[in-house]
């Protein structure tokens, strides 16, 4: 069952619709459905939902050599957040992508 496959912590998991193209080279596209687990501890290399100064973003989290929110699109620049101003709202555990538009 898809629910059992995608959701490890039901009370801490939510869905989010991706918007934009900053992660397109990482196979995360505008309109994709993200499964986000707020109970998972973010690790180096995870794709996370983060907020800085009230602005939300989805990026790859790099912890070393410097805290970085790394886009996966060469047209976008990395973000080097102040750790005191960065809030991580969850780890993206699955990406649901339609290979074609459904009409």
Place the predicted regions along the sequence by residue:
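Acidic/glycine-rich C-terminal interaction modules and beta/coil loop segments
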Residues: 2-103
